[in-house]
Amino acid sequence: MDERFNKWLLTPVLTLLFVVIMYQYVSPSCTSSCTNFGEQPRAGEAGPPAVPGPARRAQAPPEEWERRPQLPPPPRGPPEGPRGAAAPEEEDEEPGDPREGEEEEEEDEPDPEAPENGSLPRFVPRFNFSLKDLTRFVDFNIKGRDVIVFLHIQKTGGTTFGRHLVKNIRLEQPCSCKAGQKKCTCHRPGKKETWLFSRFSTGWSCGLHADWTELTNCVPAIMEKKDCPRNHSHTRNFYYITMLRDPVSRYLSEWKHVQRGATWKTSLHMCDGRSPTPDELPTCYPGDDWSGVSLREFMDCTYNLANNRQVRMLADLSLVGCYNLTFMNESERNTILLQSAKNNLKNMAFFGLTEFQRKTQFLFERTFNLKFISPFTQFNITRASNVEINEGARQRIEDLNFLDMQLYEYAKDLFQQRYHHTKQLEHQRDRQKRREERRLQREHRDHQWPKEDGAAEGTVTEDYNSQVVRW
């Protein structure tokens, strides 16, 4: 009985051993787990170290990567967000600067929707604008008589933007800029007439940093003199553009510029056919310039033109008696100036914001149907940003520029609404284009398939008939 039982027991044991041996040969990855088959670690004891297989090595902790070759991290491209850089060293320090001679492919251009100064909050419109105010598309006829007029407000990034206009636009006949010359020749294709009125093309033809009041009364006459007499019968469109900047940053930048010796004393300030008298526009300093002026001294001058400069340069000054402060009371004057500046800014063909360089580029390109060669660069470090002021000084600057603060909030809201509206229209056109392409592809396939089916049927019929004849 015992012998028969041992025979029956021996067969399953041998079979089990055979299966275990075969399993070890067939499954090499099981080596580590099968070596201690049947041995379980006691409570509180760590089991034998297992060698991670290829499939589990990716999930292994870092200390188990010793035998795995460490590859260098992949190269990272330029970030889509803010790009800090030192302020460009030039006469007018500006936050944005074109990258000269650098031409990127289309897919490498920075996304204009990406945040430029850190994480931006979700945009919520504050002002109600009509569809006409938000839609900006200019049928700019560069081969005709149309002219772009750049209103350059001090310390708003105008020097950089002006260089973009003469050196960075893709044109049939680019502007000719020679080394050592401050002005470029921007002629229309096949003509010796200029299409751009700016510091770097025509110079300060209407005075140094001429404002809206001066330009609108001066530019038409200047352009008629420069133009050929035979073209005077044709109509001409003037498209005014400008740049705005955060009032506190702009004010500090102007203070630093004046501190280095800038005066702009040759500005004409023409209004109603004359310049202001010394009593109407006194100076803040007795000497040739205001070099070394402190911020407190700069703010204490009540007739400092830096105060509310953006509103004054965009408003129609003839509405308030020009620089004659006795023409009306101060409250009424401020109300009229602010409203006039808002209306003129809204009716301009284009305006950009220094703090949003890429969105400025995007809107300009869509407005005038012109493309820039190199993308705009956002500089976050300027001389103004390096100035450390306390909260009291900042509040004082905001109070001195209370009109500019209101204008900038209005301008920023209009700018953002125009940008989002333009992006939305562009997305709609792209979707419509894709739908049209898919529809054409379907029609093309539908036209091809019946012909192929018909040809196949004809071939079968012909073969059958020929076989019948043969039979």
From Swiss-Prot:
Record region (Disordered): 39-122, 422-471
Biased composition (Basic and acidic residues): 423-454
Keywords of this entry: Glycoprotein, Membrane, Signal-anchor, Transferase, Transmembrane, Transmembrane helix
Binding site for 3'-phosphoadenylyl sulfate: 152-160, 245, 253, 377-379, 383-384
Bias kind Low complexity: ranges: 41-62
Membrane topology: Single-pass type II membrane protein
Binding residue positions for substrate: 182-183, 199, 204, 209, 257, 264
GO cellular component terms given for this protein: Golgi apparatus; membrane
Compositional bias of kind Acidic residues: 88-114
EC number assigned by the record: 2.8.2.-
Positions of the catalytic residues: 209
Residue intervals on the Cytoplasmic side: 1-4
Major localization class: membrane
Family as reported in the entry's similarity comment: Belongs to the sulfotransferase 6 family.
General function of this protein: 6-O-sulfation enzyme which catalyzes the transfer of sulfate from 3'-phosphoadenosine 5'-phosphosulfate (PAPS) to position 6 of the N-sulfoglucosamine residue (GlcNS) of heparan sulfate.
The name this protein goes by in its record: Heparan-sulfate 6-O-sulfotransferase 3
Organism from which the protein derives: Homo sapiens (Human)
